């Protein structure tokens, strides 16, 4: 697969029990169900839900959304609660749990953290396959008694976030959260298998300035942009202040103070 060629994908049932579900996802995503020797990725359906596997000898393993076990469960239990930097960035404080629009949801990890801390979170993902992984993960989370109350605070929308924000109807989110993909090649991030999936399927968010502009127009209280720590700010309005971590930075664009309800 070259950088300029669109990746080839096919849908695969991991056993006969999942053949009907595989047909469903193939139709939903507009992907072939038959095996393709030239495919770069397999969209697999099985007991653990929907997952994407990069094919080839150097495959990093399947990628799925799992809010019940693994990294998300560990962070929910031991991640530092409202003392986490992301919590401070969106304005979580005693008596304040803002309504958040996560406009670049990806695999939903940050959105889940915010929902686990009590925020109502709307997630937007523009890439249909990534949105499908997130939809499947949320559906499984809603069936788990421990995680269901958190998943109930998460709502998923598919589509272009900038367009959705410009056409927003109803009560505006208090906070818009952006974590765009950028062309900066951070080697420590690229080794993660999620990045191996995202680069060819999603590409970089070259419309980040337009996303920021739409977010600033919609958010009632603040916009938060997550960036690699040493990366430049997004072109456009300048942040009011930043919170720096070891590898990431949160640029905060305040509009008005978040107060107790």
Swiss-Prot record:
Gene3D superfamilies, per the entry: Vaccinia Virus protein VP39 (3.40.50.150)
Subcellular location(s) of the protein: Cytoplasm
Protein name in the entry: Ribosomal RNA small subunit methyltransferase J
Lineage: superkingdom: Bacteria
Residues reported in the UniProt entry to bind S-adenosyl-L-methionine: 109-110, 125-126, 179
Gene encoding the protein: rsmJ
Enzyme Commission code(s) on record: 2.1.1.242
Sequence similarity: Belongs to the methyltransferase superfamily. RsmJ family.
Catalytic activity line of the entry: guanosine(1516) in 16S rRNA + S-adenosyl-L-methionine = N(2)-methylguanosine(1516) in 16S rRNA + S-adenosyl-L-homocysteine + H(+)
Task performed by this protein: Specifically methylates the guanosine in position 1516 of 16S rRNA.
GO molecular function: rRNA (guanine-N2-)-methyltransferase activity
Keywords: Cytoplasm, Methyltransferase, rRNA processing, S-adenosyl-L-methionine, Transferase
GO cellular component: cytoplasm
């Amino acid at each position: 697969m070259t950088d300029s060629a669109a990746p080839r994908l096919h849908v695969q049932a991991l056993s006969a029990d999942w053949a009907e579900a595989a047909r469903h996802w193939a139709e939903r995503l507009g992907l072939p169900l038959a095996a393709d020797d030239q495919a770069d990725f397999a969209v697999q359906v099985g007991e653990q839900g929907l997952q994407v596997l990069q094919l080839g000898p150097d495959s990093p393993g399947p990628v799925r959304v799992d809010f019940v076990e693994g990294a998300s469960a560990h962070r929910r239990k031991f991640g530092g609660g409202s003392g986490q930097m992301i919590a401070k960035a969106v304005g979580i404080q005693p008596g304040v749990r803002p309504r958040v629009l996560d406009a670049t949801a990806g695999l939903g990890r940050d959105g889940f953290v915010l929902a686990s801390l009590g925020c109502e979170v709307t997630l937007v993902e523009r890439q249909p396959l990534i949105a499908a992984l997130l939809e499947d993960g949320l559906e499984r989370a809603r069936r788990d008694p421990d995680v269901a109350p958190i998943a109930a605070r998460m709502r998923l929308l598919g589509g272009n976030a900038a367009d959705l924000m410009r056409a927003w109807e109803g009560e505006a989110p208090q906070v818009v959260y952006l974590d765009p993909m950028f062309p900066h090649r951070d080697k420590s991030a690229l080794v993660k298998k999620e990045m191996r999936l995202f680069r060819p399927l999603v590409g970089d968010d070259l419309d980040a300035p337009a996303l920021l502009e739409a977010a600033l127009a919609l958010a009632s209280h603040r916009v938060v942009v997550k960036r690699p720590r040493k990366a430049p700010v997004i072109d456009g309005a300048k942040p009011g202040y930043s919170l720096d971590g070891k590898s990431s930075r949160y640029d905060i664009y305040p509009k008005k103070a978040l107060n107790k309800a």
